[in-house]
């Protein structure tokens, strides 16, 4: 039952980001809105044709296929872990990572770019220009949970 919950949560999170991206696509270009009453978090529409921060945007086919392969590998790893007992932290991390990976991969294949929409105002102009989406946060949080899971596993193993 827990495995179904994990798979359902993964699908829900991916669909949530895809739905938000569909709404963001209706926004006018170049418009920036504050998120709620925040002065630091802004919403804006950015089309990213590359990977993180438009890296490799000159090679859209490479980016599309690399994204597809990596999302597939992450999904297989997630499915293999879901079959085992324990490792809840790793399973949660993989589920988050898979949700973010597929959300961005589907964007690349359906639109030809990834829709990013969350930015942060900082004192550094370069950092302020970086724009994210929920899928990016899912990937980052998932990576942290996987690393934490591995760290705790090795720590416990070493203390026995």
Regions found by a protein language model. Give the residues of each.
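Alpha-helical transmembrane bundles and membrane-interface segments of multipass inner-membrane proteins
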Residues: 1-160
């Amino acid at each position: 039952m827990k495995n179904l919950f994990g798979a359902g949560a993964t699908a829900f999170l991916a669909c949530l980001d895809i739905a938000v991206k569909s709404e963001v696509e209706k926004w006018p270009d170049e418009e920036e809105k504050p998120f709620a009453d925040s002065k630091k978090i802004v919403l804006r529409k950015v089309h990213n044709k590359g990977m993180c921060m438009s890296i490799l945007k000159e090679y859209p086919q490479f980016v599309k296929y690399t994204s597809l392969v990596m999302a597939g590998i992450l999904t297989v790893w997630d499915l293999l872990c879901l079959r085992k007992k324990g490792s809840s932290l790793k399973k949660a991390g993989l589920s988050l990572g898979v949700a973010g990976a597929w959300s961005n991969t589907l964007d690349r294949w359906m639109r030809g770019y990834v829709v990013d929409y969350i930015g942060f105002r900082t004192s550094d102009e370069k950092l302020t220009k970086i724009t994210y989406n929920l899928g990016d946060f899912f990937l980052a949080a998932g990576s942290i949970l996987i690393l934490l899971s591995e760290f705790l596993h090795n720590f416990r193993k070493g203390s026995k």
